[in-house]
Amino acid sequence: MPEQNPLPFPDGQPSPPSTAAADTGATAAALPLAEPVPPAVAPSIAPSVAAARSGKRPWWARLLGRLADPWLSLTIEPDQPGRYDDGRPVVYVLEDYGMSNALILDKACREVGLPSPLVPLPGDPLERKRAYLALSRRSSSNSLIPEQRGGKTHSDSLAKLLQAHRVRADLDVHLVPVSIFVGRAPDKQSGWFAVLFSENWALVGRFRRLLSVLLNGRTTIVRFAPPISLRQTMAEGLPPERTLRKLQRVLRTHFRRIREAVIGPDLSTRRLLVDQVLAAESVREAIAIQAKRDNSKPVDAWRKAHAYAWEIAADYSSPVVRSASFLLTHVWNRIYAGVLVHHLDKLKQAAPGHEVVYVPSHRSHMDYLLLSYLLYERGIVPPHIVAGINLNLPVVGTLLRKGGAFFIRRSIKGNALYSAVLSEYVAQLVAGGYSIEYFVEGGRSRTGRLLQPKGGMIAMTLRAYLRQPRKPVLFQPVYIGYEKLMEGNSYLDELTGRPKEKESIWGLLWSIPKVLKQNYGQVVVNFGEPIALNDVLAKHAPDWDGQPLPEDEKPTWLAPAVDMLSTQIQTRINCAADVNPINLLALALLSTPKHAMGEADLIAQIELCKKLLAEMPYSDRVTVTPHTPARIITHAEEINVLTRVSHPLGDVLSVSGDTAVLLSYFRNNVLHLFTASSWVACCFQNNRRMSRAGLLRLGRTVYPFLQAELFLPWSEDRFAERIEQTIDMFVREGLLLNVTDDDGGILARNTGQTDEVFRLRAIGHSLQQAFERYYIAISVLVKNGPGVLGAGELESLCQQAAQRLSLLYAPAAPEFFDKTLFRGFIQKLRELRLVWPDENSKLMFDERLDAWAKDAKFILGRELRHTIERVSPAAAKPDVVVPPQ
């Protein structure tokens, strides 16, 4: 994979290096930026060897120290902490208590010549026979399960120290905060088990801490901070209680910022988020309404809301994510021939200061893991991922949840309490600045096309931002391209009518050995052009002044903004497509009746496709495989996509029946990239000659429907320009001939069955079935007449006609009779006012639709048009009851 420079974001937090052997000096230089300004810092002095305190360390400390020394190797920051000792008494401050912390601190002090924390100060002002204190007390439990950091703060020792300064005017103790990180970032040679016990935000028990020291003690960081003079702090004249609280607050803030700088921000906030969700006013109102509706006690409704929130919430765990990254590295190396990433550097430039919402294409369950893995490996905090509740399987669900997934139900219609809890949870994530990832398509595409977006999560994100516009939101489209799908066979079953199998832990376990034996080719992840939410709001809500909107306010511009944003996301995903070898093979081979070509013809067709992409680039973020056509064919044979049949007149390359259906998936991935060239080629399928002006007129007519179906980025004028460019290129390649040279001149294809005619037909084949679908819809409407069919009835009749056409004649691609594609076409007809509903919601139309249907003769052959008209059904008419005579 290409190397990317890690950028610490979000919130500008420094990211840890990928290995524990990072440059110590660089780390030390970065950390002071994260420290709070202390109330009083003693002046630094030149380094010196500290005079030893009177007395020896306790015998138990010497014994345990000898036992621990072989397991500890310390990186001490800064390089010369001895400069903090000027002979005045020093008390070290730790983030939390623990025997291991005391021993590590003692070892660090001995190594740099500082006074031991285990020898008390003269007079023992702490009254604990030691010279260190801690803000928090570690759990006494021996459990392996960590507790959340940030519990009760113990300040007795600090209070005693401050009181001693009030009693003794000559006393001036320096507090030196010391941060200890055991196994902050163990390298990959340490193993995934060691990572489970590496440093994180959780307070852990003694046994877990012991394992952490044994496994990761050799990658321990000890960070000394500048000293704080208690005498100068007390000189501020604050009351004793306020002095104590201020000092504790400064120390807590210091430790938190150092911890964030070293191991990243605290994302393990499941309990906190759930509590915040349940305390929100909107959820409390929903709980009250639910209790009244169910005629139950408010506590019962609260328990139901709590169960919903707990079912939804992620439980991010840094150790689990690190362990998973090690495991996934081995998995990717075994099943993929590489994972390529493009344009991530552009995201890193745009993302600082923004909350990033990742909106990738969704074609495989691998999407969840791949994107989070790639971000983590490049120093970016993985996002919280929206996942379907069907993936909340035993064990697997827990691991996904600890990797940042939060689970939502497929349908929340009619469940106001669940909707309120989910909306509030998303609002808390947005307000907290967490990055989020969701799939606007709602589910995995079974056809390879981008599905029509569902705006539910986008609407929740917008409303959350409008409620608390703290940090600008950036939507990041991501295209994920595969050469072979793990779910290919199950998609094939679903497309042929078999119901989708429910996910189960046993099914997953059963599939693992089979998956690990396969070669799934290469994966490419392309980051598209980001979309700033504020730019969308500036267009749809120019009067919004940036002030928070009340939760119950629903502005009229919200729905159009959601629709525009969801369409723009899909368009930007398509603008970041990758064209891999299997995409190019699918475009070529599926254009032939038997899905087979001679090797020379296949090489020529692939070369033509690559030339079209190079001479008429779709966008600057589209990537194309650099392989030659010959290498593409070899690669397809290696991953068992292509079959070679030897023949004396030349080898024939083909795909089998099931593989051909699956190849249509990969053709559809990149269909939008060839829209203009396919359109021009389609017009010459059944026409020997055609005028340039006619091509442009028909192109403008059909473009709105193609744009809605394929999420194309151009205006009609820009699409017309691409048609002109395509014509010029086809003329240069000899695929078309200029009969006359004027602007509206006549173009012609070659006569007979030449190679040029064959290549032109192959280019046009990919859009042929789209135009057939359009004609089916028009034919069904015209056959039934205006005011007869509703939109839903028309969809069903179109689907039936397409299925029958596929059964009686040449088999079609699975999406040919996809009802959602007919629905999109009908919706666009309504937007263009070519059809409109009457008072009974029946579709009306006029002679313009007849004229539109007549234009089909330029694209579809006479026989095909006649066949479609024959299979187009009429609506069932109610039986007429004849009254008795």
UniProtKB/Swiss-Prot annotation:
Pfam families: Acyltransferase, GPAT_C. The keyword Ligase does not apply. It is found in: Cell inner membrane. Residues 1-17 have a biased composition (Pro residues). InterPro entries: GPAT/DHAPAT, GPAT/DHAPAT_C, GPAT/DHAPAT_LPLAT, GPAT_PlsB, Plipid/glycerol_acylTrfase. Belongs to the GPAT/DAPAT family. Pathway: Phospholipid metabolism; CDP-diacylglycerol biosynthesis; CDP-diacylglycerol from sn-glycerol 3-phosphate: step 1/3. GO terms for molecular function: glycerol-3-phosphate O-acyltransferase activity. This is Glycerol-3-phosphate acyltransferase. Its main location: membrane. Residues 1-26 are annotated as: Disordered. The keyword Repeat does not apply. Keywords: Acyltransferase, Cell inner membrane, Cell membrane, Lipid biosynthesis, Lipid metabolism, Membrane, Phospholipid biosynthesis, Phospholipid metabolism, Transferase. It is a peripheral membrane protein. It is an enzyme of class 2 (transferase). GO terms for cellular component: plasma membrane. Its EC number is 2.3.1.15. A motif (HXXXXD motif) lies at residues 362-367. GO terms for biological process: CDP-diacylglycerol biosynthetic process; fatty acid metabolic process. It comes from the Bacteria. It catalyses: sn-glycerol 3-phosphate + an acyl-CoA = a 1-acyl-sn-glycero-3-phosphate + CoA. The HXXXXD motif is essential for acyltransferase activity and may constitute the binding site for the phosphate moiety of the glycerol-3-phosphate.
